[in-house]
Regions:
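Short, basic, glycine/proline-bearing loop/turn elements
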Residues: 12, 82-89, 119-124
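A secondary-structure boundary/capping signal
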Residues: 26, 41, 66-67, 115-117, ...
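A transmembrane-helix-recognition feature enriched in membrane-embedded lipid enzymes
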Residues: 1-26, 50, 74-83
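Glycine-rich helix-loop-beta junction characteristic of Rossmann-like nucleotide cofactor-binding loops
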Residues: 27-31
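Residue-level signal for beta-strand positions within conserved beta-sheet cores that form or flank
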Residues: 20, 60, 178-180
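Catalytic core of membrane glycerolipid acyltransferases/transacylases, capturing the structured
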Residues: 18, 32-92
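Short acidic/polar alpha-helix capping motifs at helix-coil junctions
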Residues: 1, 13-18, 40-43, 64-68, ...
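Non-catalytic C-terminal accessory region of glycerolipid acyltransferases
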Residues: 3-4, 96-222
Length: 222
């Protein structure tokens, strides 16, 4: 067990394991060595617990890029810090510094995780079948040459809805465990026609890993 895996083991409350099941498939697509950009959809703060599970099962730390405010969220922030996360200040100059830190991590053969949607979608964007992504993942892939490994997850919003202050776990909320599902796909074949075209390919690969029902309720507030 690596130091990072040990920290995450400590952070993941054992009682939660009675009420959450992680169904993760596609780990054969997750490279065991070399630089990797891991890109997936974003539905809940509980998504970061899923990434912690990927670290535990995949055996590789994930340097998660996330908006700097998340590093101050209880438990979630501790997970981000434990994984050596890269805080992103959306102010232009500081965002460039975060991007540079991600390049350095990839050049060192590390895994950098990103959620190209940038934030948990609201309203119709949360429920809709089409995921819209920003171009950061594509630009990072072009600059580093690292492969983009897509993942799709669902069920996290049931455990930690956007409007909730924390995860809804335990007999007060559920009579039986809730299953969170994750599907990891093969490297995205980027068309190379620029960041916009590459982003479209990345988002399509993520959507292909999701079931048709995953964008449905519960619906966050507008």
């Amino acid at each position: 067990m690596t130091d990072v895996q040990g920290k995450l083991q400590h952070l993941f409350n054992p009682r939660w394991q009675r009420w959450v099941r992680f169904d993760i498939a596609g780990l054969e697509h997750y490279p065991r060595t070399g630089p990797v950009i891991l890109a997936g959809n974003h539905r809940s703060y509980f998504d970061f617990f899923v990434l912690a599970q990927l670290v535990r099962r995949g055996g590789r730390p994930i340097r998660m890029m996330a908006k700097k405010e998340l590093f101050d969220v209880p438990v979630v922030g501790r997970i981000c810090h434990a994984m050596g996360g890269i805080p992103v200040d959306r102010h232009f100059t500081r965002a460039i510094e975060s991007y540079a830190a991600a390049i350095v991590a990839l050049e060192a053969g590390e895994v950098v995780g990103m959620m190209p949607q940038g934030t948990i979608p609201r309203g119709d964007a949360f429920r809709g079948p089409v995921l819209k992504g920003k171009t950061g993942v594509a630009r990072l892939a072009e600059a580093s040459g690292a492969p983009v490994i897509p993942f799709g997850l669902w069920g996290t919003d049931v455990i930690w809805p956007r409007e909730a202050k924390g995860p809804r776990i335990g007999p007060r909320h559920w009579r039986r465990p809730v299953t969170v599902r994750v599907r990891i796909g093969p490297p995205v074949q980027l068309p190379g026609g620029g960041a916009v075209a590459d982003t479209a390919a990345i988002m399509a690969a993520i959507m292909d890993l999701l079931p048709p029902s995953s964008p449905l309720p519960p619906l966050p507030p507008p």
